[in-house]
Structure formats: C-alpha cells, structure tokens
C-alpha cells in the first residue's frame, strides 16, 4: 500500500535524482529565475571554471532590484547599480539566457514576471537567489530562495543538494471581514506565532478561505512564508490556478495543457497524510493589521495599542520591544491609529500585482492624498502597468496626487533611488520592516494596499474600512 503523502513530499520526491547513504538528496531544478544582484558572482564562477550553463533554456532573467522606477534610465542608477545591470546584460547574452531587460514589455520584479509569463507551473522545482522565492509556491511549485554559490551550482548542473523539510499545515477557516486581505492574514499569523515558528518547515496553506482566493492573493500569502521562518510556502493547485496559467507564454498549449491539468490535479496532499505540525485559524476574527516595530512579528490590529513591556515575560522580547520603539519613535501602550505618515509605498513582490492596485484605486478614486504625504504607486511588472493603464487606474492615482511609476522593486529595499530619509515614516505594502530597510534611519509600517491607500488620504495610520462603508 502506498504511503499517504503531503503536497510538499510529492513534489520533493518526484525531483530526487540521487540520494546516497547518509547524504543529502540531490534535486533536479526545473526553473531558475535570476536578477542583477545575486547573479554576477555566479556567472563569474562559471567563466573561471570554463563551464557552460546546463540548461540556459530553463533560466529566466530580469532587472528589478536596482532599476530606477522614475525613468527606467540606466544613467539614473548609481554606479554600482549600473554595473550590476550591465553585467547581467552581458552575461545573459554570452550564456544565451532570456533577459527581460530595460524597455522589455515583460520586465518586472522576478516573483511577478515568473508567474505572469507561465514560467512558474504547478509541481515544478523553482529557485532564485532571492529570499521571497516562496511566492511561487502559490501554484503548487516547490520554490525556495538560494545563495549565490547555489545559483552557480544550478547554472552548472541544474541540480541542488537539499535536506527534506518538515511539513506544517496551516488551515484557514471562515471568510475575511470587509477591508481585510491576505496581507493582514500573514501579518496576523507572524504576530501570533513569531518569525521563527516556521523554521525548518515547508508550509502548506489550505482550508475554506484558501480555495476561494485569487492567485494574486495566494501569492501574497506564500511570499511572506519566509517572514514566518519557513523556507517554503505552498498551496495545492486547482481550477483557479489552471485558469490563471492558461494561454501564458511559457505554459503548455492545446491538448498538452489538458494533459498537464490532469497531472496537476494529483498535486494535493493525500487523505491521511501526516504533517509534523499544524495550525488552524479562524480568519473571520482578523482585523486590518499594522506593524509598529522593526521585525514582522511586531504587528497589531488597527484598533489595538502597542504592547507594554509587562506583556512579555521573556527578557529578549522585552529588549526587542524597547529597542524597536526607540528606533521608530513610538511609546508603549500607544494607539497606532493616528500616527503621522510621510510616505506611502504601494508595490513590491508582495503587493505589486493588478489586484493590489485595483484595491488601492478603489479607495483613492475621487479623493486626494494628504498634502504632507508623498505616495509612490509602483506596478510589479510592465505587464501589470499596461493592464492598470488599460483600466484607467493610472489616472485615478495621478488625479489623487500619487506618483505613477515604472516596474521594479523600488522602495521595498534601499538599493535603488527610491529611499526614505532618516526619520521619515513609510506606510508600506512590502514585506520587511527592518532597521533602515527603506533607507538609512527610515521607519516602516507594513500593511495591506487598502490600508496604505487610506493612510495616503489621511496622512496618518488609519482604518481602511471607513472608506469601504464598514
């Protein structure tokens, strides 16, 4: 009798090409995404060893981290950024890798362009030299971030040694309140259990809520599995997945697509499959979530107060709270609603998709942003930008007083020309609120696109639900 397997175990086991005694299994890698920041050293390693790429056709490159979203002009980038971008252009040409370069209609953030081109498919193994590669697990892919030396190894061999992870099931019951989204769900989850709860695990999100989510919403959830401590976040593919993939450039076509769908339907955890850990959440109780500190677990509901030191028994947690509040210039027991905001950033691989922009536009339509707020709307890809413009979303944003940008990582990280100044407070739809993440001395408050749009209007942290008739 065949042993019942989880989704993760099925995909992992199907890709083991060799497993020696007392050795880590070697996995075949189906898809490799690369960008300008973590690929130069890997290409250099290949050149020094006089190697070619094993499967350049299974590699897709894009320019995203360093690019200026103001102009897409290479000359607008810093010297280091310019060098990284031109190096990627040269390397992809030399090794025969498809590059979504500056001016390409499909250029964008690596974790957005992969799915929208059909490069990401259910049941594949997919890696990238970026920690948020778990995003692609929303398709039932086994996707994880790797280091630069591993990037080189995949280029050379199309394989990787990987220890098998433990499995965790997170079942989401119920439905969201109006004004609550998957960004709020993942922030709530991290706040409840901490940033280390998922360490050593491959997470599978399932349940009533998950089945009803769009692919965009599923990607937001899997994207931040890494902030929960997990290496992998997965969702079993279904008809919503298949419909999203159908017709995309790299997706199977015609009868072949139907054959793949039959296989993809088998990519779900078997009845009776054993997980090493499980969590069950009633999502109907979740309210819009806002981060107040300097790690993604320091999060509260919009109507809650910042914790007091007495709320924590652990000395390290107490110190973490005090250090965070000192940095962000907030107080214990302070109400988060009403805290002044300087910049609003709507974008990133977490929330830079068309659905995210629609949510923000619904709130901003017919309204003006606060006179003291600078608001950046940065589509995650040029395809998202075009689709948004076809719907007239760009006009809504511009009329509201926002800056409508080109595609890129932008203010998610202080690596390009979109940075906050020291002491400036950013309402951000990105995934990390570390010290200086958005610029030296910058202060980040993580939230959903709806909450960020509401903050842009009021100039303070506020409840988005007042703009949704709640």
From Swiss-Prot:
Family: Belongs to the aconitase/IPM isomerase family. LeuC type 1 subfamily.
The keyword Magnesium appears for this protein: no
Keywords linked to the UniProt accession: 4Fe-4S, Amino-acid biosynthesis, Branched-chain amino acid biosynthesis, Iron, Iron-sulfur, Leucine biosynthesis, Lyase, Metal-binding
Protein name: 3-isopropylmalate dehydratase large subunit
Gene Ontology molecular function: any one: 3-isopropylmalate dehydratase activity
GO BP annotation list: L-leucine biosynthetic process
Entry note: cofactor: Binds 1 [4Fe-4S] cluster per subunit.
Cofactors that this protein relies on: [4Fe-4S] cluster
Enzyme Commission numbers on file: 4.2.1.33
Binding-site list for [4Fe-4S] cluster: 349, 409, 412
Catalyses which reaction(s): (2R,3S)-3-isopropylmalate = (2S)-2-isopropylmalate
PANTHER family: 3-ISOPROPYLMALATE DEHYDRATASE (PTHR43822:SF9), HOMOACONITASE, MITOCHONDRIAL-RELATED (PTHR43822)
CDD domains attached to this UniProt entry: IPMI
SUPFAM superfamilies to which the protein is assigned, alphabetical: Aconitase iron-sulfur domain
Function: Catalyzes the isomerization between 2-isopropylmalate and 3-isopropylmalate, via the formation of 2-isopropylmaleate.
